[in-house]
Amino acid sequence: MKSTVFFVLMVFELINTASGSHFLGGTITWRIVNASATGSPVSVVITQTYSWLYGLITCTNAMIAGSQLIGVGVFTNLYSTYLNCVANCGNDSRGYIAPNVVPHCTDVSAYLSTTIGQRSDTVNLEVDDDFAAAFKSNAWRTLTLFTGTGSWSISTRITIKKRSDNGLYNNAPVATMMSPLNIPVLKPTIINVPIADMDGDIIRCRWSTSNTTGVDECGGVCPPDSLPINTVIYPNCTIIITGPVVGNWFAV
């Protein structure tokens, strides 16, 4: 059975220096707790992983050891920000209670100016639910190319339907790359995005758009406008990109 990376929006940056606002990208994935479950509700684990600018979003080794939430600093609005339903809400998202987006501190590098956090939440959904949820905001670190205010929208589509080939619930494929990435200036670089599917399906990358069945998947950083001229993105999850100027940042 073929599948596409439709459920996961992976956002990453290509970087030479670090400065500016606090968000560096992230991923949202989900999996069925018991693929052979019968009846409702169906338990689903949603995992959010985000990368932030170190110094503005706090993480320490002690916080990692204590499984503490990241320190949001002046960005206290994050405490009231949730992974809200953004499409097919209501009858197609029965039982969904949106989790908060503030993650537990998992990794930190002062040298790379990066804080990474992750959280997993279990939600109980109804059979045949099919909806999209997203983390939306507008505090990207300074980017070279973007539209509007440089907002982001990291979305995931959650579908609670059994497969026709084996009668089990399907799990979402995942992309496991985190930002930021470094690329050399004026040299074409091939980036292969790591992807996996726990059901063993053949998967491809469908790159995000601003209006996929009514869902904004990328905000102000939708490709190709967010990338340098002559960047090529392929459905096999490969990007060929050339950084034109030292210090440029791009998002996809």
For each feature predicted by the language model, list its residue ranges:
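Long, compositionally biased, intrinsically disordered segments
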Residues: 2-252
